[in-house]
Design a protein with these regions (language model features):
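PAPS-dependent sulfotransferase catalytic core
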Residues: 1-63
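PAPS-dependent sulfotransferase catalytic domain
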Residues: 61-140
Length: 140
């Protein structure tokens, strides 16, 4: 399968921005043309680029890196999901502190992370790659 789209898909406060930036930099270092060049502001924009550009792009030098905070389908064409997982207790604390929100919203973010992990563990192992936040944090 010719994968040209990498999806960073997880909840906020789990290292997703770090993974997004590192993925883009590794591809650039490998002399791959990383798209989109202008970073979209919303999930909708990422999906539009995926549908209108990535799916029809036959240039093997082009790779698309998308970052969204929602669970993806198990069968996106030409795609691979990269997802981060983190101790839900740490997600709850981090979300509350950095997002300046109440405890119930932070608890929901932690529960959402468990849902991502539960669902993504049912997907084909060649389609999803897990990155533990604690490993990112300890080796950076």
């Amino acid at each position: 399968m010719n994968i040209n789209s990498l999806w960073i898909s997880t909840t906020p406060r789990t290292g997703s921005m770090w993974l997004y930036n590192v993925t883009r930099e590794i591809l650039k270092f490998s002399k791959i043309n990383v798209l989109p060049t202008k970073i979209p502001k919303s999930s909708l924009e990422f999906f539009e680029i995926f549908e209108k550009q990535s799916l029809i792009d036959q240039n093997n030098s082009n790779k698309y890196v998308f970052k969204i905070h929602r669970i993806l389908n198990p069968n996106l064409p030409r795609s691979k999901i990269l997802t981060t997982i983190r101790d839900p207790r740490d997600v709850c604390i981090s979300f509350k502190e950095f997002m300046k929100t109440d405890f119930n919203s932070a608890l929901k973010a932690a529960k959402d992370l468990l849902q991502y992990e539960k669902i993504y563990k049912t997907y084909n192992k060649d389609y999803v790659k897990f990155f533990r936040y604690e490993n990112i944090e300890n080796k950076s």
